[in-house]
């Protein structure tokens, strides 16, 4: 037989639940704009810009080569894929993996990420845990097992309390992960307010990801262009155009009436 239902004071909703939601939301908004202010522009070399433009030209040739004559297509393809001195064959780039110990820019970016992501979470989480400790804020609308008690009832040591109830400290962490859709709606998909995404990137090492290997990109594009054949898309376009009923008489009458009035 189930025990009596726990009745919460309505002041908890006004002075605990809503303040935690509002504080978490505005901290995320401030983090987004602070990250924009601290964001450093990544400097690209002339070689990187040139390589990216070459890859774009090759991709455009594969996609739209059917709209140029076959000789023009083969000439451009020969420039990229010539087995002897083609661009993708003769061009070799030296890829140097970045090292945080030798690159001050990476160290600065890591420090900025810690300042805008880790430090606010520690400070705000500690302040909320100290200010609103010991409160039961809400209850999830479905039953949970006892394994969820350490996650949803931080700061409350009640063995008899149902695992569906959420403490104030756990309510803060639920808001950190639950406001992602609100941030995406207000700030756009790629925003710095989503603290959970920042944490995942730091844990998976996405923030220190290796740069793309230009040589592999050239090889992939060479293979894709090598498999592309020219298929003339404008074959018999003159006959098709002449066979259509273009209704020139109606167009001329409309222009004549417009000029009269």
Curated annotation (Swiss-Prot):
<dbReference type="GO" id="GO:0005789">
    <property type="term" value="C:endoplasmic reticulum membrane"/>
</dbReference>
<dbReference type="GO" id="GO:0032977">
    <property type="term" value="F:membrane insertase activity"/>
</dbReference>
<dbReference type="InterPro" id="IPR008568">
    <property type="entry name" value="EMC3"/>
</dbReference>
<comment type="similarity">
    <text>Belongs to the EMC3 family.</text>
</comment>
<dbReference type="Pfam" id="PF01956">
    <property type="entry name" value="EMC3_TMCO1"/>
</dbReference>
<keyword id="KW-0256">Endoplasmic reticulum</keyword>
<feature type="transmembrane region" description="Helical">
    <location>
        <begin position="15"/>
        <end position="38"/>
    </location>
</feature>
<protein>
    <recommendedName>
        <fullName>ER membrane protein complex subunit 3</fullName>
    </recommendedName>
</protein>
<feature type="topological domain" description="Lumenal">
    <location>
        <begin position="131"/>
        <end position="168"/>
    </location>
</feature>
<keyword id="KW-1133">Transmembrane helix</keyword>
<feature type="topological domain" description="Cytoplasmic">
    <location>
        <begin position="39"/>
        <end position="114"/>
    </location>
</feature>
<dbReference type="InterPro" id="IPR002809">
    <property type="entry name" value="EMC3/TMCO1"/>
</dbReference>
<feature type="transmembrane region" description="Helical">
    <location>
        <begin position="169"/>
        <end position="187"/>
    </location>
</feature>
<dbReference type="GO" id="GO:0071816">
    <property type="term" value="P:tail-anchored membrane protein insertion into ER membrane"/>
</dbReference>
<dbReference type="GO" id="GO:0045050">
    <property type="term" value="P:protein insertion into ER membrane by stop-transfer membrane-anchor sequence"/>
</dbReference>
<feature type="transmembrane region" description="Helical">
    <location>
        <begin position="115"/>
        <end position="130"/>
    </location>
</feature>
<keyword id="KW-0812">Transmembrane</keyword>
<feature type="topological domain" description="Cytoplasmic">
    <location>
        <begin position="188"/>
        <end position="261"/>
    </location>
</feature>
<feature type="topological domain" description="Lumenal">
    <location>
        <begin position="2"/>
        <end position="14"/>
    </location>
</feature>
<comment type="subunit">
    <text>Component of the ER membrane protein complex (EMC).</text>
</comment>
<dbReference type="GO" id="GO:0016020">
    <property type="term" value="C:membrane"/>
</dbReference>
<comment type="function">
    <text>Part of the endoplasmic reticulum membrane protein complex (EMC) that enables the energy-independent insertion into endoplasmic reticulum membranes of newly synthesized membrane proteins. Preferentially accommodates proteins with transmembrane domains that are weakly hydrophobic or contain destabilizing features such as charged and aromatic residues. Involved in the cotranslational insertion of multi-pass membrane proteins in which stop-transfer membrane-anchor sequences become ER membrane spanning helices.</text>
</comment>
<dbReference type="GO" id="GO:0072546">
    <property type="term" value="C:EMC complex"/>
</dbReference>
<keyword id="KW-0472">Membrane</keyword>
């Amino acid at each position: 037989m189930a025990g009596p239902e726990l009745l919460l004071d309505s002041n908890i909703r006004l002075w605990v639940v809503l303040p935690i939601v509002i504080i978490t939301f505005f901290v995320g908004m401030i983090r987004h704009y602070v990250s924009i202010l601290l964001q450093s522009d990544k400097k690209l070399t002339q070689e990187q810009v040139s390589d990216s433009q070459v890859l774009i030209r090759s991709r455009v040739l594969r996609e739209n080569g059917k709209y140029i004559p076959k000789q023009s297509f083969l000439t451009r393809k020969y420039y990229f894929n010539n087995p002897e001195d083609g661009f993708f064959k003769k061009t070799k780039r030296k890829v140097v993996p970045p090292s945080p110990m030798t690159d001050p820019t990476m160290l600065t970016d890591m420090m900025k990420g810690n300042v805008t992501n880790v430090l606010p979470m520690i400070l705000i989480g500690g302040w909320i845990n100290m200010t609103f400790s010991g409160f039961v804020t809400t209850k999830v609308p479905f039953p949970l097992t006892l394994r969820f008690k350490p996650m949803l009832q931080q700061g409350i040591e009640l063995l008899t309390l149902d695992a569906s109830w959420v403490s104030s400290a756990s309510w803060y962490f639920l808001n950190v992960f639950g406001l992602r859709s609100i941030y995406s709606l207000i700030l756009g998909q790629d925003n710095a307010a989503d603290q959970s995404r920042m944490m995942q990137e730091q844990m998976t090492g996405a923030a220190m990801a290796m740069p793309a290997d230009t040589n592999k990109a050239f090889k992939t594009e060479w293979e894709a262009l090598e498999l592309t054949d020219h298929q003339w898309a404008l074959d018999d376009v003159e006959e098709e155009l002449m066979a259509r009923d273009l209704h020139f008489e109606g167009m001329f009458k409309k222009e004549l009436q417009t000029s009269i009035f």
